[in-house]
């Protein structure tokens, strides 16, 4: 459950999840992942014991979602590749429901060691799966569950108000259905964060023959992504205050920078917060645009304030120079501490504090 990322939670300006399950007594669950145990596991997974695997559909069946009517249909008879797709079956099960849950994504057969994906669009007819479920279900809200490792172009769901929630589950393993059910119903408050930058389009991704670091990873990315590295929502809210920075570090690699900040759970639920510390070099040409230098995940009860601390070592501030050697630049550094990267258009509803220090 700890890796699940809540990417969208917006129902006409209000949070949609967690579900008040008894409000959605008629539901449908569609897509190639609902009852396909193999798709719950990524590359290099151990041998599966299928008797112990809880699929997403099995997990949802343990809740009150669709207590009067729970329709389901994979739609794609060839799994996530979804080259063989039955639109009529998907549309039929989505008619007249109060809630739609769509599963989409990749699999270890579409992305694995020695087989990178060549595009970030949903494979096969999965985009038709989304639009069929949407058009057949009237005005019912839609939850998109994603199962993948590589970033995908889900801009349609991100910008579409019918898609009230998006959850990134990755390849969650044998208890997948239990984890998903717990998040949907609020038994667990998600706090996963994206470990990579999700480009808005393939045009933002450099060609593989370009060996520079320009636009590669969050450290050198200068464009507006679909979702930034380190992003992830919560069912509660957090506020940062009282940032303190003290430095004994120098450019010889001695000493350290100590950082402390107060984090307050200002919402109505207990939850984990992932505090992130980033550094920017001022006027250092060889340096990345920004770099993560500290991360801490802490459970914080509603109304509680805690102190989160980091120790930054000088070697974390090294850059590779034009002289082909590592060097710790002398000068001013900017530090940002919060639940996300600073200055991101797609952001979580918490503040980011900043300070400077010198070496």
Predicted regions and their residues:
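A short helix->loop->beta-strand "cap" motif at the edges of active sites that frequently abuts
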Residues: 67-68, 136-142, 161-164
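Intrinsically disordered, low-complexity Pro/Gly/Ser/Thr-rich segments with frequent PxxP/GP/PP motifs
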Residues: 284-320
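Short glycine/proline/serine/threonine-rich loop/turn segments at secondary-structure transition edges
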Residues: 316-332
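An anion/phosphate-binding loop that grips the pyrophosphate of nucleotide cofactors and donors
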Residues: 97
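Short acidic, flexible loop segments centered on an aromatic residue
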Residues: 268-287, 292
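Secreted, periplasmic, or luminal enzymes acting at the cell surface/secretory milieu
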Residues: 1-43, 48-55, 61-63, 147-272, ...
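Glycine/threonine-rich flexible loop motifs
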Residues: 38-39, 104-123
């Amino acid at each position: 459950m700890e890796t699940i990322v809540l990417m969208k939670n917006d129902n006409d300006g209000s949070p949609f999840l967690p579900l008040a399950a008894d409000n959605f007594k008629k539901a449908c669950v569609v897509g190639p992942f609902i009852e396909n145990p193999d798709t719950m596991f990524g590359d290099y997974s151990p041998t599966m014991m299928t008797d112990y695997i809880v699929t997403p559909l099995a997990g949802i069946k343990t809740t009150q979602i669709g207590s009067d009517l729970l329709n389901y249909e994979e739609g794609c008879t060839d799994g996530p590749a979804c080259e063989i797709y039955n639109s009529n079956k998907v549309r039929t099960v989505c008619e007249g429901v109060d809630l739609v849950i769509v599963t989409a994504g990749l699999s270890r057969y579409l992305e694995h060691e020695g087989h990178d994906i060549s595009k970030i669009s949903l494979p096969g007819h999965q985009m038709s799966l989304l639009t069929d479920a949407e058009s057949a279900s009237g005005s019912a809200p839609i939850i998109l569950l994603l199962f993948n490792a590589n970033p995908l172009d889900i801009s349609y769901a991100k910008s579409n108000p019918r898609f009230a929630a998006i959850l990134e589950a990755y390849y969650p393993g044998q208890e997948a259905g239990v984890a998903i059910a717990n998040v949907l119903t609020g038994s667990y408050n998600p706090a996963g964060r994206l470990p990579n930058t999700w480009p808005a389009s393939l045009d933002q991704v450099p060609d593989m023959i370009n060996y520079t670091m320009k636009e590669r990873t969050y450290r050198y990315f200068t464009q507006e992504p679909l979702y930034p590295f380190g992003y992830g929502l919560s069912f509660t809210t957090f506020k940062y205050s009282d940032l303190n920075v003290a430095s004994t570090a120098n450019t010889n690699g001695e000493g350290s920078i100590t950082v402390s900040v107060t984090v307050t759970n200002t919402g109505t639920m207990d939850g984990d917060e992932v505090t992130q510390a980033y550094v920017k070099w001022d006027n250092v040409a060889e340096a990345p645009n920004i770099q993560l230098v500290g991360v801490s995940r802490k459970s914080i009860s509603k109304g509680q304030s805690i102190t989160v601390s980091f120790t930054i070592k000088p070697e974390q501030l090294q850059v590779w120079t034009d002289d082909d050697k590592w060097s710790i630049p002398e000068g001013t550094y900017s530090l940002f501490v919060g639940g996300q990267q600073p200055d991101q258009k797609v952001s979580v509803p918490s503040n980011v504090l900043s300070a400077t220090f010198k070496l």
